[in-house]
């Protein structure tokens, strides 16, 4: 049986992951539960983990997985599980099993070739997007409407959003985005970077998901949106 605070935290984590695909930060959890310190959140997370409601994913910053909610047994949660490659998808990265590719009439897997357009900085911006280096064959279930491309991540500025160095991000081509979206931003037509977009009055803020990096503020004429994050592929 969970305490009131344990139940509140579990619901908050579960709802946030359904909305954004990313677990809330300790500060967000602390504020949501009206606690004075993050140590209280740490104790609640340990208690939920010991009771089998969540698990912390090793060697990843801010990585939690909800295993079950109250009323669902651990056996129910684990029944029928099998190993499948993990794919993080959604506009802010939602962890889901990679969907199985559909077969065509000849029994071959119907895949979509997505161009990999070089590397993108999740850190200090690097030179503008490079030309196509190779392609990835992905099942159509992974793709939303529109044209897509992929980029290889270099840097650690987005680790709190679950995006790590050497990950491959799937980007939908578009030149607009909502505040809070993770986007490929082209700065002064020279530097490309992967950051969270925030609008601050007439200015645009490119926000890292790592406290070691400062938010950068630009005039609207200096930043062009090159696409929005819709998926992430990680190789183990």
UniProtKB/Swiss-Prot annotation:
Belongs to the peptidase S24 family. Keywords: Autocatalytic cleavage, DNA damage, DNA repair, DNA replication, DNA-binding, Hydrolase, Repressor, SOS response, Transcription, Transcription regulation. It comes from Methylocella silvestris (strain DSM 15510 / CIP 108128 / LMG 27833 / NCIMB 13906 / BL2). The record marks 122-123 as: Cleavage. The active site is at residues 157, 195. GO terms for molecular function: DNA binding; serine-type endopeptidase activity. It comes from the Bacteria. GO terms for biological process: DNA repair; DNA replication; negative regulation of DNA-templated transcription; proteolysis; SOS response. This is LexA repressor.
